[in-house]
Amino acid sequence: MFRRRGVTLTKALLTAVCMLAAPLTQAISVGNLTFSLPSETDFVSKRVVNNNKSARIYRIAISAIDSPGSSELRTRPVDGELLFAPRQLALQAGESEYFKFYYHGPRDNRERYYRVSFREVPTRNHTRRSPTGGVVSTEPVVVMDTILVVRPRQVQFKWSFDKVTGTVSNTGNTWFKLLIKPGCDSTEEEGDAWYLRPGDVVHQPELRQPGNHYLVYNDKFIKISDSCPAKPPSAD
């Protein structure tokens, strides 16, 4: 289960391989850091944008994970289970293109998680002298981690809400997002977003009070309380 403070905020996991970090406005962009492959399809694409002022090469690496989080266990995916194309992209400044992911794994009722790392590599290695006399790259390699969720081929989207106890439970076999905004007039930044995997339970006192409370599943909003007029927030 993940919690995100501020429902419009995005927590990017960026790793600069060298000591200089590129400005976020001039680096790789891949959109939402969690994306899903729906149960009824075997294909999903992810758009990559080069926001730099010069050309970049993009590559990806995939690890199977038992469950997203700080203590996740990473393993090599079973051969042929999750394929992608192309092997790499070469994008000029401002260009964008798609990586495509193809699932050929089991068609059962279990949800599967993969950590997909997008690696942005400069086409040229520009360097400068550091104050200590060393050589530092001015265009670092950047790695952005995302999570691909393959929804079960036999999907069951189920949930329960108990207003008395302030509890939302994921009783199905696939993930969804819970948006909690305390009060009917609170801002997006005052809300919380929770990512509930199968079996996860959220207990929050705000769920017992009036507020805008939604589930987000397959980009659709589901209002779970009638204490405020319907006004769907952003899903980002």
UniProtKB/Swiss-Prot annotation:
Species assigned in the record: Escherichia coli (strain K12)
Swiss-Prot/TrEMBL induction comment: Negatively regulated by H-NS. Positively regulated by IHF and EcpR.
Family of the protein in this entry: Belongs to the EcpB/EcpE family.
Keyword set, alphabetical order: Chaperone, Fimbrium biogenesis, Signal
Signal peptide from the UniProt entry: 1-27
Record's function text: Part of the ecpRABCDE operon, which encodes the E.coli common pilus (ECP). ECP is found in both commensal and pathogenic strains and plays a dual role in early-stage biofilm development and host cell recognition.
Xref: SUPFAM superfamilies: PapD-like
Extra remark: Not expressed under classical laboratory conditions, but is functional when constitutively expressed.
This protein's encoding gene: ecpE
Name assigned to this protein: Probable fimbrial chaperone EcpE
